[in-house]
């Protein structure tokens, strides 16, 4: 079990609090000027394909010393061991947390309640391989004998965000199959998707562990009705629908052959499920071998995380730096900024991964915390963000630590596009770190022919304070393996922060209340009778909705 240590009661936290008093005066220009080896000291390589530069952070060796001491005092190493050994660290649900077993390419036994889960994991992988080979190869036929051309994944949350993010990020590896993702219960999402596909050549993947998720099953029934409007015979459903689920009776009742049901387990959290059968859409999009490469990449990062001392452990370093900003500098958000258009959903994926995991105000003792926990995560691809929100990062009043991610090698080396992209990648972190002082601004204005009065009027608005912290994550190329590295790196960063904050990162009770109330309200929307059972605001909104519809 995880320890229940209040981080603010540790010696390291007190030391960090004292250190922060002097650290507020840190200036990145001075830190780099004083230490020619700063980049070498504050960067790390993962294998031969990833470089993580954290030198442009408001830290020095003393900062890191206290942060590593905090990790040790909160018994992080024991927590890592507990997770990987299958202990039920998701204590509020009584479950192990073993998404790492899904990508355990070593096949070393992983025990849950004394039973090795690896044979079951490998059996599902073999089933996925056979299925994807048949569909991709054209052997799997629809009800009219035609090969499948389109895959529609119907899921929500972890059953959608992860597969969608990965299939987009790995688009250069795609085969001939067209992938579509439907998540929102808004009928527009399924209706617009169905306009693009042919019932004779479409395969639907229904991704719901329980096969009861409201949004997913509503969309699934709409898809089935649409399909049967053309196909007619209920028996044809089996050729066009597969299930990613554990509820065999419900799957069978829907009309899906349970031979085409791919199971996963309660020790797989939704936001960590792309490594499981939920990743079937990924395997169909890029081929099973590339899906295995994705697993291999994550497994490599798992090995690094488990076996590397804290001081050289990349997810640990990133997590601790995040805590430094979140809990001492008062930063409320972090931006993830991939300079790769294929990775346009990466920030959204980790928005769920981080905020659903660590958006908690109750500690592992069941008490309200007295300190900040999970940050707000957001971001967009560069260079788009530069023309949207970077203004606030550069010159706003909020401290927003940023992760910049970019590949050295583009999948689309058109003209000088990639050099221009990368020049922006390098320039932004330099500008954020070092800014532009008033003397430089004034000199530039004078050189541009401005008179003294104009210089005095304009100069204040063109000053950049700098000291905006960033991490730069440079990847040789985005491949299935390096993408697996990156995803696992961020997963483990989130875990480390949750351990230190003394919260449970693998439940998500915060999504339940809204669901319960929606189920109560749904029957109230069935007719035009006036509602008075809620607060005045909710009553007013429901009654206005009914009036608008009338």
Curated annotation (Swiss-Prot):
Its EC number is 5.3.1.9. The lineage of its organism: Bacteria, Pseudomonadati, Pseudomonadota, Gammaproteobacteria, Vibrionales. The active site is at 356 (proton donor), 387, 515. Pfam families: PGI. GO terms for cellular component: cytosol. Coiled coil: none annotated. Keywords: Cytoplasm, Gluconeogenesis, Glycolysis, Isomerase. Catalyzes the reversible isomerization of glucose-6-phosphate to fructose-6-phosphate. It catalyses: alpha-D-glucose 6-phosphate = beta-D-fructose 6-phosphate. NCBIfam families: PRK00179.1. It is found in: Cytoplasm. GO terms for molecular function: carbohydrate derivative binding; glucose-6-phosphate isomerase activity; monosaccharide binding. The keyword Membrane does not apply. GO terms for biological process: gluconeogenesis; glucose 6-phosphate metabolic process; glycolytic process. InterPro entries: G6P_Isomerase, G6P_Isomerase_C, Phosphoglucose_isomerase_CS, SIS_dom_sf, SIS_PGI_1, SIS_PGI_2. The keyword Chloroplast does not apply. Belongs to the GPI family. This is Glucose-6-phosphate isomerase. CDD domains: SIS_PGI_1, SIS_PGI_2. PROSITE patterns: P_GLUCOSE_ISOMERASE_1 (PS00765), P_GLUCOSE_ISOMERASE_2 (PS00174), P_GLUCOSE_ISOMERASE_3 (PS51463). Pathway: Carbohydrate biosynthesis; gluconeogenesis; Carbohydrate degradation; glycolysis; D-glyceraldehyde 3-phosphate and glycerone phosphate from D-glucose: step 2/4.
